[in-house]
């Protein structure tokens, strides 16, 4: 007797949910051995937040020290170690790897791929980052303490004569190891985007976030090998007497050129992905397609190209760079960034806006990053830069740009994609409390630092005189820093509570208006992401899947990648026929 196969229409792929859990303690084994991009993305993100909180505690210690002159509960040496490791952790152990956290979580889903191109290399990249970060931070437990020469490690301050001890060596070694993980992660993301897009997913149908990760990964391959080589040279100087960075040979300026040729593309390496996150979120809460898709892509490419031509604006005060060229290029890079602002505002214009927590953080990003960008244009002028270089004006600018971009957009992304990754919703009331504490605390901390810099307070000083007149501003800044620190408590509680007890998501798209493919699969997705893929005929496949009655109107309005006009009304494109249904 033979069994008769059921009719084709009755077949349905069903996910066995929930997953089998295994014995107690199995989670640790799964974390160590996993190659699932979603789990690796969560591991990246959780690890980055751990580093973020450690770096934030260091900042609170420094702000407490600066609240009043003569306080000195930290020694000068401890203060130097804190600002060095604060900058290192925030930039290289939080901001850069959290890019790969979001890329792992979202990018394969957005292009319809079952995983990244090299899953084991992906896991290897994470472990390199983790152990590299631990090596760099372990300087605090060795005799002599951690690295204390600033996160920029200017020579000769960072050589063996001026900064002896294991802390500097651990810092160099840790950044080499973590940087290798970043380089391998970039190779993986480029290969994934180029080789693993779903049928119908042309380059100009990719989500903007995917575009930005692709461009960021290319920038990483340009910038990070230079940092790695420069660090190897510094290690050779410290241990082999290589004299690469000897002042007599022009080595001091050589280090600055090498470091900043990495350092300025690095600013955009940690900005572009978060521009992408903002570009994914705003259309969903404006109930509109993204305005100016093509110009956003070209603006991203322009920023990437210009980012490798402006590094010496960090070196205006050396008197050894061509001021007009680097000043002009720095002004120029504001143009594509302004285009992005124009598109974000255009997306919201006349939209049906609602202000859930992800959208609130997007608005916070827009305001904060705009102010930071304006002070950046001011610093692009050499006469102004000469006045405020190495003062708290630069510190304020730097934090407005980077906190405004990275932290606000990180929180926006966490609140936006948390339901997709966990199958549960975060608490909106706690989310709004978190936003307002973060927004108020940040601006209270850093707005007054512009005035401190204009008054002449130098950065990296552990104390100042009562007669300097800096104390009122420093008190305000310290109060803001503690508000900012307090804002993390509702966030951590929200994540913990919601992950275990939050409202369960029963639909593919809990926000209702998602555009890209991650909103066309379950929450959380199955191991290989999709049981079936919708047709990809525009840059909004999930929206068209959920609102098929809108497709004809969208075609008539001629969105990106579509032929339009009366003559094309009945034309069926070849790639529409070939995509799987």
UniProtKB/Swiss-Prot annotation:
Residues holding Fe(II)-heme a: 86, 399
Disulfide bridge partners, by residue number: none
Record-listed heme a3 binding positions: 397
A molecular function GO annotation: heme binding
Binding site for Cu cation: 264, 268, 313-314
Associated pathway: Energy metabolism; oxidative phosphorylation
Record-level GO BP terms: electron transport coupled proton transport; oxidative phosphorylation; respiratory electron transport chain
Cofactor remark: Binds 1 copper B ion per subunit. Binds 2 heme groups per subunit.
Cofactor: Cu(2+); heme
Membrane topology category: Multi-pass membrane protein
Gene Ontology CC: one annotated term: plasma membrane
Subcellular locations according to the entry: Cell membrane
Reaction catalysed by this enzyme: 4 Fe(II)-[cytochrome c] + O2 + 8 H(+)(in) = 4 Fe(III)-[cytochrome c] + 2 H2O + 4 H(+)(out)
Family per similarity comment: Belongs to the heme-copper respiratory oxidase family.
Annotated function: Cytochrome c oxidase is the component of the respiratory chain that catalyzes the reduction of oxygen to water. Subunits 1-3 form the functional core of the enzyme complex. CO I is the catalytic subunit of the enzyme. Electrons originating in cytochrome c are transferred via the copper A center of subunit 2 and heme A of subunit 1 to the bimetallic center formed by heme A3 and copper B.
NCBIfam families for this protein: CtaD_CoxA (TIGR02891)
Protein name, as recorded: Probable cytochrome c oxidase subunit 1
UniProt organism field: Mycolicibacterium paratuberculosis (strain ATCC BAA-968 / K-10) (Mycobacterium paratuberculosis)
């Amino acid at each position: 007797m033979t069994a008769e196969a059921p009719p084709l229409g009755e077949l349905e792929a069903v996910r066995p949910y929930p997953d089998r859990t295994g014995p107690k303690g199995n989670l640790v084994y799964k974390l160590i051995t996993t190659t699932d991009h979603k789990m690796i993305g969560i591991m990246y993100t959780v690890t980055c937040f751990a580093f973020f909180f450690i770096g934030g505690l260091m900042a609170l210690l420094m702000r407490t020290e600066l609240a009043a002159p003569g306080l000195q509960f930290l020694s000068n040496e401890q203060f130097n170690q804190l600002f060095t490791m604060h900058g290192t952790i925030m930039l290289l152990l939080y901001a850069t790897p959290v890019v790969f956290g979001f890329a792992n979580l979202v990018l394969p889903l957005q292009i319809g791929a079952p995983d990244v191109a090299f899953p084991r290399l992906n896991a290897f990249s994470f472990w390199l980052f983790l152990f590299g970060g631990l090596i760099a931070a372990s300087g605090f437990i060795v005799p002599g303490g951690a690295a204390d020469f600033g996160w920029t490690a200017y020579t000769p301050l960072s050589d063996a004569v001026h900064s002896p001890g294991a802390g500097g060596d651990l810092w160099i070694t840790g950044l080499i190891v973590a940087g290798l993980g970043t380089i391998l992660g970039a190779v993986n993301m480029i290969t994934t985007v180029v080789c693993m897009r779903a049928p119908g997913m042309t380059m100009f149908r990719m989500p903007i976030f995917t575009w930005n990760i692709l461009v960021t990964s290319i920038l990483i391959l340009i910038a990070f090998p230079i940092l790695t080589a420069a660090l190897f040279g510094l290690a050779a100087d410290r241990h082999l007497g290589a004299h690469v960075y000897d002042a007599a040979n022009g080595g001091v300026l050589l280090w600055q050129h090498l470091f900043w040729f990495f350092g300025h593309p690095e600013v955009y390496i940690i900005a572009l992905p978060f521009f992408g996150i903002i570009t994914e979120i705003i259309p969903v809460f404006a109930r509109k397609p993204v305005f100016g898709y093509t110009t956003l892509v070209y603006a991203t490419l322009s920023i990437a190209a210009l980012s490798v031509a402006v590094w010496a604006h960090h070196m205006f005060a050396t008197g050894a760079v061509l001021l007009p060229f680097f000043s002009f290029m720095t002004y120029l890079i504001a143009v594509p960034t302004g285009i992005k602002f124009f598109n974000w505002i255009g997306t919201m214009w006349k939209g049906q806006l609602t202000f859930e927590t992800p959208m609130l953080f997007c608005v916070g990003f827009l305001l904060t990053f705009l102010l930071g960008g304006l002070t950046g244009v001011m610093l692009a002028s050499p006469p102004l830069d000469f006045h405020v270089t190495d003062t708290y004006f630069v510190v304020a600018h730097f934090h407005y740009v980077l906190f405004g971009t990275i932290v606000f957009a990180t929180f926006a992304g966490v609140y936006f994609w948390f339901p997709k990754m966990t199958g549960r919703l975060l608490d909106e009331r706690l989310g709004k409390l978190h936003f307002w504490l973060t927004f108020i605390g940040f601006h209270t901390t850093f707005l007054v630092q512009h005035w401190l810099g204009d008054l002449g307070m130098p950065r990296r000083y552990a104390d100042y005189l009562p007669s300097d007149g800096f104390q009122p501003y420093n008190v305000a800044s310290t109060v803001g820093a503690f508000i900012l620190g307090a804002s993390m408590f509702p966030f951590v509680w929200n994540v913990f509570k919601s992950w275990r007890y939050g409202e369960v998501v029963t639909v593919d798209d809990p926000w209702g208006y998602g555009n890209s493919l991650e909103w066309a699969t379950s929450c959380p997705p199955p191991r290989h992401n999709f049981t079936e893929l919708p047709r990809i005929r525009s840059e909004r496949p999930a929206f068209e899947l959920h609102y098929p009655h809108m497709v004809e109107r969208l075609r008539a309005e001629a969105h990106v990648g579509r032929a339009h006009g009366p003559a094309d009304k009945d034309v069926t494109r070849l790639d529409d026929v070939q995509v799987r249904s």
